UniProtKB/Swiss-Prot annotation:
NCBIfam families listed in its UniProt record: recR (TIGR00615)
Organism domain of life: Bacteria
Molecular function, one GO term: DNA binding
Family: Belongs to the RecR family.
Identification of the protein by name: Recombination protein RecR
Domain Toprim: 80-175
The entry's keywords: DNA damage, DNA recombination, DNA repair, Metal-binding, Zinc, Zinc-finger
ZnF (C4-type) intervals: 57-72
Chain's role: May play a role in DNA repair. It seems to be involved in an RecBC-independent recombinational process of DNA repair. It may act with RecF and RecO.
SUPFAM superfamilies linked to this entry: Recombination protein RecR (SSF111304)
GO process terms (BP): DNA recombination; DNA repair
Amino acid sequence: MLYPTPIAKLIDSFSKLPGIGAKTATRLAFYTISMSDEDVNDFAKNLLAAKRELTYCSVCGRLTDDDPCIICTDETRDRTKILVVEDSKDVSAMEKIQEYRGLYHVLQGLISPMNGVGPDDINLKSLITRLMDSEVDEVIIATNATADGEATSMYISRVLKPAGIKVTRLARGLAVGSDIEYADEVTLLRAIENRTEL
């Protein structure tokens, strides 16, 4: 269908978002133009503010508006454990269960040989540097149960084992191919309680 140029551009912009197909992008575009000017301005202002004000924590790599982030500066956290996740959404999912009280490390991606993403392309070097001068005795790998998540998990385990650091993986309450951010709280709780050593 042929749309006026401004709508077509808006549809194109929405369709660049992950998980948004042509139909959803079209619905979002038409909904957006039906919003009041005030609501559209607020939406645009909030989008720009998030883009400008957020940064990655210099310690853990999590998206934050403070650097270092509130988790890294919390002295009540267990500093002997680091839970490694793919992205900041996974930190939020784990924090929701209120069971894990250690630190985090956000990789900002996964090793993906099929897509040409190697260990140097994700936030992995800073994890190794972080471990060298710390009291961490366990690294818990909480990558998604996908081929890339498994490849990343095995690589991290292989790199850290010689250093004598215990490396564990979340238990398999998570279905293969599932994303941590979509898992329910009970599944995440069981996965962390029953983690296995790699």
